[in-house]
Amino acid sequence: EMESRDWSSDVCSSDLESVLAAYNAANTTNYELLPASQYTMSSTEATVEAGTSASQPIEINIKPLSQELKESGKKFAIALKLKSKDAGQGVLQSGSTIVYVLDQVVYQAVPTINSRNNVHMTMRQDYELTEWTVEFNINIDKLGTAVGELNNQTIFGAWGPDGKDGEIYIRFGDAPIEGNRLQIKTQGTQMNSNMLFNANTWYHLAFVCTGTKLYMYVNGVLDNSMDLAGKIVNLGSKKIQLGNMDYLKANVKYSELRFWTKARSQAEVANNMYVIDPKSNGLEAYWKMNEGEGYSFRDASGNGNNAETNGQAVPEWIQDVRIDGK
């Protein structure tokens, strides 16, 4: 006959780094432990009483993140580990650890870019790239729907320095495709999106080149891919911009513009669409575009890549925008 008795476990505060490290490795994430000062627990002991299969709930209260933590770009989690108080009885391994991930809902000011105030970058150097990633959040208020309608609305352009070949050119529409179909040009070829986009809608867009493969992600999901020749992509220090002055008829809101000198994986893209650690490996330039005023945009990576509107024309700023569109 099985004995009916109470079983007690402690919610441990030790060895939590390894718990979170295992979670990060399994999910291609980079969460850090939330500082203990940022949350409280109603109890550190869980007891399953005789004749029952669950303990009383333990309440975790999470305090609002400090401004410093919000601006750090880091993502936080609470890791918990159960350890039996009875030396003769263990805790089932499959249920002994719990990880609560905390993803910020990002509200920020965003600039409105159009044909009158393109953004031009002054980078710290020229680039010779085999791998790269460009990503940003975008909301465009005017898109054509017919073939050739409102074509060539540039949303990102980068070209080689004088005398060198190179291009990363991203636009909505082209003469033979619909105005609400996305297109990227690089290495002398081009790729169109499978998706047709809606105006006045927030999207996270990411374009990843491994050298011989090009990927397009929309909201972290693969939309299209193609093989490439593996050419070097040269980019000039003063040859990167947002928008164009002739074909761009829309107002375009931007946030979280990032330029990487490495190919990001699908999981890395999907898990970091709205927040990223500015010191991430390979993050060459990072414009949050959340200043809320003015005509210049700070490079949060610390690499000193400057960005400002042409002619110092101050864009319209929209305050307190939820950039995931939800």
Pin down the residues of each PLM region.
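Single conserved hydrophobic/aromatic residue that forms the stacking wall/gate
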Residues: 1-11
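Short, aromatic/His-centered strand-loop micro-motif at the edge of beta-sheets
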Residues: 183-204
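Short glycine/proline/serine/threonine-rich loop/turn segments at secondary-structure transition edges
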Residues: 66-77
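Extracellular, beta-strand-rich glycan-interacting domains
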Residues: 131-142, 248-272, 284-294
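Short tryptophan-centered beta-strand motifs in secreted/extracellular beta-sheet-rich domains
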Residues: 136, 198-209, 214-216
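Flexible glycan-contacting loops in extracellular carbohydrate-active proteins
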Residues: 226-253, 278-282
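Extracytoplasmic low-complexity segments
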Residues: 96-112, 274-326
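Extracellular glycan-recognition modules
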Residues: 106-179
